[in-house]
Regions:
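Immediate flanking context of iron-sulfur cluster ligation sites
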Residues: 52-61
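Catalytic-loop motifs flanking and including active-site residues across diverse enzymes
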Residues: 66-71, 109-112
Length: 130
């Protein structure tokens, strides 16, 4: 079981050394969103393979430690998932990954990247139905 300090160190590691923080071009999905209360801005990117799985994911943006760390962590989790898998991801999972007691007062920051990605995945699926 991870301690509160373990969760904090993981968040700080993802903030200080973000994974996949870059604009992904070409991409199949690009969507942005923000959290005016905290000044967070996140742009999520994804490229799909021929089977409809996420082959690469990245993000750009700026904001608080939690929103940026959550986006970094999410990009690692997205690779290999289908858009349907993304639709099934829950905000509770994100909060658990970040440490529930660490981010309990900052859930909008913690779930911003997933909110953007879920919305973009739904839009892509609607627009590309055969």
């Amino acid at each position: 079981m991870l301690t509160r300090q373990d969760y904090i160190e993981n968040i700080l590691d993802h903030y200080d050394n973000p994974r996949n923080k870059r604009e992904l071009n070409p991409n199949d999905i690009q969507a942005s969103g923000g959290n005016p209360g905290c000044g967070d801005i996140v742009v999520m990117f994804a490229r799909l393979d021929e089977d409809g799985r996420i082959a690469d994911a990245s993000f750009s943006g700026e904001g608080c430690t939690i929103s940026q760390a959550a986006a970094s962590m999410l990009t690692e989790e997205l690779v290999g998932k289908t858009l349907e898998d993304v639709g099934r991801m829950t905000f509770e999972d994100v909060v658990e990954d970040l440490g529930k007691d660490v981010v309990s007062t900052r859930t909008r920051c913690a779930t911003l990247a997933l909110t953007i990605m879920k919305s973009a995945s739904e839009k892509y699926t609607r627009e590309h139905r055969h």
